[in-house]
Each structure stands twice: as structure tokens, then as C-alpha cells.
């Protein structure tokens, strides 16, 4: 093993991905090893490292590391509203997340740099009969940096178990917009697919670059233990969008003034925004009957955030998105 490969194996985020679910109470019943291939084996321990840096006329993807099944090829510059913005698409060579997968991602935006990170399509968490899948995401945004992390929805198949932990370390002058969309499952595929997963556990936390905690949000969904169709949870909706916007306080009031609460049970959409603790930013949540409605609400919030923070809007949406 080369020194570089050894360093990647021992990367803190990757080590955390392997340890994340071991002591999680919600996964205590799912510690058995898969019969096919042990958890975290070669090909099941993915890693991505993306470091963005500012150069004279644009930001660039200055450093990249990748280990299967995680893959990134190169940065493209397709955002006509921000021509200097490197856009990177994360790819999975396995096509979905499988039992025993341990995934880790490190994204570092250096001072004054910008970046947009997305996925090529929805992420599917495959059916499981043993163990679980885990994911660590670690974001660092330095002074004056700007990061958009806007992946496509995650679709948990029935009997799947998935735990994810995200940490955003950010300078007070920087901006990060982090999005996640969770579907109820493949509701048109099988009668037991809608909320048929065993566990979905998500933790998102933010801190300043000195390590001072700004906020923590964690939720554990176990639809076979307690129905998610209750009022105050999903209330018959099938898609959940969660957007964290960390940005200087001077932008908060202007953004909130343009994002009124919206509840339309007949139209199948509900959304709203509020402030995060410690004046660190805003949180926007949306519920819908399908991913299209939730993605449209998120896109509108994203558009407003861009306009108020950067003074530019979003480009026209690609037809295939």
C-alpha cells in the first residue's frame, strides 16, 4: 500500500463512517454482517475528498481523492450566472447504497473560493437483510467562501437502514447552502414500499472554524415503530426537503421576507423557513406528495438566497432535471 493510499484509509471521516453505526441505539438490532461481503470491505468503503481554491479569474477543483464506489471526474463551469463557479457531480459506481456500505465525503472550500456539488441522479438505499449503511459528510468553508451542496433525493427501499452524519464548519463571513430530500420509498413499486424502510437516522451540525457549536439537528425515523403519517410529521405527504442556509446575519431578514409559510393540502405542498440558533443562518423545510413539488420549493428558496447574498439568480433549469 502506498503512503497516499494509507493516508486515505486513515482519513478521520472514513474512520468515523466505519464507526458511526456501531453504538447508535437505533441500529442496535442490525449489527449482523452480510453473508455476501463483510461491511466496509474493499468496494464498500467509499471516499471523496474535494478541495476548492480561488485562482485569478475563477475557483477550481484544486484537489480530489476518490475511492470506489464514490466517484468524481472533473469540475465543469455550466452555471452562466456565476461563470467562475466549479460544478462537481458525485457519482456512485455501484448504482445505489448497499448493506454494509461505509461512505465518507470531505469538501473543503478555501478562502474566497466557491463551489457547487450535486449528484447525477437520485440516491437509492437498497433493500437489506443484514447490517446497515452509514455516511459521514464533512464540509469546511473558509473566510468569504461560498458552497452549494444540492444533491438529488434519497430513496430508501423497504427494509433498508441508513444513518448519516453531517458536520459543516464555517467562517462567519462565509455562506453554505446544504440540501437534502428524503422520499417515502418506491411507493409505486410495491404496496409495502411506502415508508417500508426500517431506520433512517440523520444528524446535521454546524460549528465555526474554532469548533464552537452553532446548532445540531437530529431525527430518527422508524416507520415500523411509529407511523410517519401523523399530524406534525409527514401528514400523508411522501417527500421531505430540508435546507440549511448558513450565511451572515445581514442577509437573514431580507430572505425571510421573501419566503412566506405555504400550506396547501389540496395542492400537495407545505413549506416554510425560520431562523437557526446563534444567528448562524436559516432552515427551510418542505413537504410534498412527490419529489417534483419539493424540489421546486427548494429551488425557489435557493434562488432567493442567491439573489440576496450574491446578487445573482439561478440559471435556467436543465430540461432533464
Swiss-Prot record:
The keyword Cell inner membrane does not apply. This is Urease accessory protein UreD. Keywords: Chaperone, Cytoplasm, Nickel insertion. InterPro entries: UreD (IPR002669). The keyword rRNA processing does not apply. One of its GO terms (cellular component) is cytoplasm. Required for maturation of urease via the functional incorporation of the urease nickel metallocenter. It comes from the Bacteria. Belongs to the UreD family.
